[in-house]
A protein has these predicted regions:
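Class I SAM-dependent transferase core
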Residues: 2-36
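A short helix-to-beta-strand connector/capping loop
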Residues: 10-11, 84-89, 180
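Conserved beta-strand segments that form the floor/walls of ligand-binding pockets within enzyme
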Residues: 15, 67, 130
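Conserved Class I SAM-dependent methyltransferase catalytic core
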Residues: 15, 20, 32, 138-197
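Conserved SAM/SAH cofactor-binding pocket of Class I
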Residues: 25-123
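Active-site-adjacent beta-strand anchor residues
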Residues: 66, 134, 161
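Mobile active-site "lid"/loop adjacent to the S-adenosyl-L-methionine
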Residues: 113-140
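C-terminal lobe and adjacent flexible extensions of AdoMet/dcAdoMet transferase-like proteins
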Residues: 198-202
Length: 202
């Protein structure tokens, strides 16, 4: 695999394949604000190049990193090895929670979701799948909100990144309807949207 790009974050270097989402403002927002503590089991959904999984592994007891993109899994494994985090991270290829075992529970679930409204053609490439959220930007978010709480430990947290273009209030409402407490933790203004970090507690 050829890695045409390098991304730097703090003391880490991440190689990014052409078929893998390149970390941007949304990735860095989650990287800076994620609340990993020692002895926690972490699920990194949509791991991409592995930046969040590697950073979470600094403190976490264990990390499970999932992506539907096989190129992303290969790239993330390489980055975990390069950054000395491979032993703590288990990588799984699959669609959202499908690779998660029914009896698995996590203290922290992290997801930089595909959140931008998109046309069907934009979802066909592997990179497109990382950002394209369907006609209203919620195609993947809605599935995640419905399924992820099933794997959240008692007292656990979810940190979800999405856009102001994909109905943040709907996300909060859906989590609250599942007897969770959701709120906007922070947001960053970029060109034509706000990137929003939603925090959820059980």
């Amino acid at each position: 695999m050829v890695y045409p790009k390098k991304v730097y974050f703090k003391d880490y270097v991440f190689m990014v394949d052409e078929h893998v989402y390149e970390p941007a403002e949304d990735s860095f927002l989650l990287a800076e604000k994620m609340t990993v503590t020692e002895d926690e089991a972490v699920l990194d959904m949509g791991t991409g190049c592995g930046i969040i999984a590697v950073l979470a592994a600094e403190k976490a007891k264990s990390v499970v990193a999932v992506d539907i993109n096989p190129y992303a899994i290969e790239c993330a494994i390489k980055n975990a090895e390069m950054n000395g985090a491979r032993e703590k991270i288990e990588f799984r290829h699959g669609d959202l929670v499908k690779p998660i075992k029914p009896n698995e529970h996590f203290n922290l679930i992290l997801f930089n979701a595909p959140y931008l409204p998109s046309e069907p053609d934009e979802e066909k490439s592997w990179v497109g799948k990382a950002w394209a959220g369907g006609s209203n930007g919620r195609k993947v978010i809605d599935r995640f909100v419905m399924d992820a709480p099933n794997f959240l430990a008692v007292g656990g947290r979810i940190q979800l990144v999405q856009s102001s273009l994909s109905d943040v209030n709907r996300t909060i409402q859906m989590f609250n309807e599942r007897n969770l407490r959701a709120m906007v933790a922070t947001q960053v203004k970029v060109a034509f949207e706000r990137i929003v970090l939603v925090e959820v507690k059980r």
